[in-house]
Amino acid sequence: MNINLTLFGQTIAFAIFVWFCMKFVWPPLTQAMQERQKKIAEGLDAAGRAERDLQLAQERAAQMLRETKEQAAEILDRANKTANAIVEEAKAQARSEGEKLIAGAKAEIDLEVNRAKDQLRAQVAALAVTGAEQILQSTVDGAAHNDLVAKLASQL
C-alpha cells in the first residue's frame, strides 16, 4: 500500500467524520451548552433579585421596627403625661378639699369662740349683777367692797 493513498483515504475519512460531527453532533451540543448557559444566567439573575428583595425586606423590617419603637415611645410619653396630669389633678383636688376642710374647721372654731364669748358675757353680766346686789345689800364699807371686787375678779 502506498502511504499517499492511505493518507488521502484517512483525510477523506476524517473530513467525513468532521462533517458528520458538525452536522449531527455539534448542534445539539452547542444548543445544550447555550441552554445550560441561559439557565445559569437566569439562576444568577434570580439570586441577584432574591438578594435585593432580601435586602429591601430587611430595610423595611428595620424601618418598621424603628417606627414601632417611636410609636411605643410616644405612647409611653403620652401615658406618663396623662398619669402626671391625673396626679396633679388629684393633688389640686386634695388641696382644694383640704382648704375647704380647714375653712370649715376655722368657721366652726370661730363659732365656738363666739359662743364661748357670749357665755362669758352672760356669766360676767350675771356676776356683775350679783356683785352689785351684794354691794348694795351690804353696808358701805371700803374693805368689804375691796374683798367683793377681789372675789369678782377671781371668778372671772
From Swiss-Prot:
It is a single-pass membrane protein. Gene3D superfamilies: F1F0 ATP synthase subunit B, membrane domain (1.20.5.620). One of its GO terms (molecular function) is proton-transporting ATP synthase activity, rotational mechanism. SUPFAM superfamilies: F1F0 ATP synthase subunit B, membrane domain. Keywords: ATP synthesis, Cell inner membrane, Cell membrane, CF(0), Hydrogen ion transport, Ion transport, Membrane, Transmembrane, Transmembrane helix, Transport. CDD domains: ATP-synt_Fo_b. It is found in: Cell inner membrane. GO terms for cellular component: plasma membrane; proton-transporting ATP synthase complex. It comes from the Bacteria. The chain crosses the membrane at residues 7-29. Disulfide bonds: none annotated. Belongs to the ATPase B chain family. F-type ATPases have 2 components, F(1) - the catalytic core - and F(0) - the membrane proton channel. F(1) has five subunits: alpha(3), beta(3), gamma(1), delta(1), epsilon(1). F(0) has three main subunits: a(1), b(2) and c(10-14). The alpha and beta chains form an alternating ring which encloses part of the gamma chain. F(1) is attached to F(0) by a central stalk formed by the gamma and epsilon chains, while a peripheral stalk is formed by the delta and b chains. NCBIfam families: ATP_synt_b, PRK05759.1-2. F(1)F(0) ATP synthase produces ATP from ADP in the presence of a proton or sodium gradient. F-type ATPases consist of two structural domains, F(1) containing the extramembraneous catalytic core and F(0) containing the membrane proton channel, linked together by a central stalk and a peripheral stalk. During catalysis, ATP synthesis in the catalytic domain of F(1) is coupled via a rotary mechanism of the central stalk subunits to proton translocation. This is ATP synthase subunit b. The lineage of its organism: Bacteria, Pseudomonadati, Pseudomonadota, Gammaproteobacteria, Pseudomonadales.
